[in-house]
Swiss-Prot record:
It comes from the Bacteria. This is Phosphoribosylformylglycinamidine cyclo-ligase. One of its GO terms (cellular component) is cytosol. GO terms for molecular function: ATP binding; phosphoribosylamine-glycine ligase activity; phosphoribosylformylglycinamidine cyclo-ligase activity. The keyword Transcription does not apply. Belongs to the AIR synthase family. Keywords: ATP-binding, Cytoplasm, Ligase, Nucleotide-binding, Purine biosynthesis. It is found in: Cytoplasm. Pfam families: AIRS (PF00586), AIRS_C (PF02769). Disulfide bonds: none annotated. Its main location: cytoplasm. It comes from Methylobacterium nodulans (strain LMG 21967 / CNCM I-2342 / ORS 2060). The gene is purM.
């Protein structure tokens, strides 16, 4: 080809070579997520998964996608990018396991104004860690460099996961009724919801991300707030397997909307949930947020998980076996309340949060 040299894609702000270099850098991370059904090799046009090799006989597929909201902004402003990928995986696979399904594979979308391969590799390092925790394979993704759409090297993330359950094993199960008991599984902190409010409170406090965290001795504020979302997949799948059909009737991932908005999603018509807030060991971060931002308890409950990241609805006569199975899997279940006849509100509270 001859002729006068014109503009190049790189001069327009898109560096294909940087993208290719990043793909090569992350291949070992991706391979570390191999599992039955997937070899976790990337570079082709699509990722493959073999359901038969994964051991399923008559599966129903379950899909979920999510992001991590403005928690990404804290990762960007602190320069800490190696755990935000764990959050991305958690937000998707926790939504899959509440259906009674095993997460099988994961794909990510990473969009940025300017691709910095080291940052991208750190993000994928977290994604791979999340996939290993969940037992799912990272089989593909997309890195999009879009100058002019994002400011500098700012970025956003989205995740996509697919899981499977044998036909007839899906949750919630029919028969949720008054008298069933409700367990809570502790969160690691704020997880990945409510960060627009978190960032507003931090700004009002006058603290920088590198300041000592008032609620976490020995850690900076940014580091503490970036604590990754817990992934509940392995303990919940272990408990479902150990206790058999009918013991665990429903699971609810406590994300945006908190208890009031997420619990009704798994309830049939005519029943509600009564929770005793006195039973929750509220992590110190929530007390600091509530006091510093003067956030009312009702707003805390509808914005944050307040210390409980997953709720488990259990048949009353199977409660001991479910608690034992969860403890055996490393969880610390808390008895939060019970299923009741539906009143004016589907979720009612007694006691108060220790904020």
């Amino acid at each position: 080809m001859t002729g006068e040299r014109g503009l190049t894609y790189a001069e327009a702000g898109v560096d294909i070579d940087a993208g290719n270099a990043m793909v090569e850098a992350i291949k070992p991370l991706v391979r570390s997520t191999r599992r039955p059904g997937a070899d976790a090799e990337i570079g082709g046009f699509g990722g493959l998964f073999d359901l038969k090799a994964a051991g399923f006989k008559d599966p129903i597929l379950v899909a979920a996608n999510d992001g991590v909201g403005t928690k990404v902004k804290i990762a960007i402003e602190t320069g800490r990018h190696d755990t935000i990928g764990i959050d991305l995986v958690a937000m998707c696979v926790n939504d899959i396991v509440v259906q009674g399904a095993e997460p099988l594979f994961f794909l990510d979308y990473y969009a940025t104004g300017k691709l910095v391969p080291g940052v991208g590799a750190d993000i994928v390092r977290g994604i791979a860690e999340g996939c290993r925790q969940a037992g799912c394979a990272l089989i593909g993704g997309e890195t999009a460099e879009m100058p002019g759409l994002y400011d500098g090297s700012d970025y956003d993330l989205a995740g996509f996961s697919v899981g499977a359950a044998e036909r007839g094993a899906l949750l919630p199960r029919p028969g949720i009724a008054p008298g069933d008991l409700v367990l809570g599984l502790p969160s690691s902190g704020v997880h990945s919801n409510g960060f627009s409010l978190v960032r507003r409170i931090v700004a009002a406090s006058g603290l920088g991300w590198d300041a000592p965290a008032p609620f976490a001795p020995g850690r900076s504020l940014g580091e503490a707030l970036l604590t990754p979302t817990r992934i509940y997949v392995r303990p919940l799948l272990a408990a479902l397997k150990a206790t058999g059909a009918g013991a665990i009737k429903a699971l609810a991932h406590i994300t945006g909307g908190g208890f009031p908005d997420n619990l009704p999603r798994v309830l049939p018509e005519g029943v509600g949930i009564a929770l005793d807030l006195d039973e929750i060991a509220v992590p110190p971060v929530f007390g600091w947020l509530a006091r510093t931002g003067k956030v009312a308890e009702a707003e805390m409950l509808r914005t944050f998980n307040c210390g409980i990241g997953m709720v488990v609805v259990v048949a009353a006569d199977r409660i001991a076996s479910v608690e034992a199975a969860l403890r055996e899997a490393g969880e610390a279940p808390v008895r939060l309340g019970r299923i009741t006849p539906r009143g004016e509100a589907p979720v009612t509270f007694s006691g108060s949060l220790a904020l």
